């Protein structure tokens, strides 16, 4: 019988996938301090920010701000996933904890880069970040299989976004391109896990495509 929950018969296979993810992630473990151009930093009290200090094209800055304001919602994303998968497969709860720890560095890296390079008005970016987090995240999908599908698509979209922005940024700041590609590696691993969870369910019961198609048709980034 088709349900919108995850199938407990798949838990052993998903546990194997989770262990494989941890091994792959450990091989590329990193700290966000490794990817920041610290030598470009200046004291904002001693040298106040001025628009003349900005060196990146406005389109690149907008892309980085967009990524940052998506990543800062991690607490809301984690709350959403934890609530949605409560009572479902324990391995998914374990993965969400790992996913959160790996995603936690992303907003720190992006915001610190923008501040170090003086690419944004520090007061404005602080206000934007606060406003976005206060606004929260209202999901459109509330069942485990739909949430899994939504997160798969979101990770894929974010991975593609980071890689595309890195291509453009490489002409203006190699440091930025490098850190974006590093973020894309995390997104690639996360996407692969979520995708494979969906794949195993489709292999077991092809009619899961009913729920999956609904998410695909109505998907939008947070």
Question: Which residue ranges define each predicted feature?
Answer:
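Non-heme di-metal
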Residues: 1-222
């Amino acid at each position: 019988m088709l349900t919108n929950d995850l199938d407990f018969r798949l838990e052993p296979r998903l546990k194997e996938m989770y262990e494989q993810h941890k091994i792959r992630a450990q091989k590329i473990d990193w700290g966000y301090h490794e990817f920041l151009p610290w030598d470009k930093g200046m004291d904002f009290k001693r040298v106040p920010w001025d628009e003349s200090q900005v060196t990146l094209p406005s389109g690149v800055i907008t892309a980085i701000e967009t990524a940052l304001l998506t990543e800062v919602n991690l607490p809301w994303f984690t709350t959403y996933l934890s609530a949605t998968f409560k009572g479902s497969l324990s391995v998914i709860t374990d993965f969400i904890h790992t996913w959160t720890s790996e995603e936690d560095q992303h907003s720190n890296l992006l915001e610190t880069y923008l501040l170090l390079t003086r690419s944004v008005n520090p007061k404005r970016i602080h206000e934007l970040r606060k406003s976005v987090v206060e606004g929260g995240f209202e999901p459109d999908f509330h069942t485990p299989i739909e949430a899994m599908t939504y997160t798969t698509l979101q990770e894929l979209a974010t991975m593609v976004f980071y890689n595309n922005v890195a291509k453009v940024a490489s002409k203006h700041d190699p440091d930025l391109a490098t850190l974006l590609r590093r973020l894309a590696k995390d997104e690639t691993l996360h996407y692969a896990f979520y995708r494979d969870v969906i794949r195993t369910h489709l292999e077991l019961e092809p009619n899961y495509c009913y729920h999956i198609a609904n998410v695909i048709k109505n998907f939008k980034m947070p």
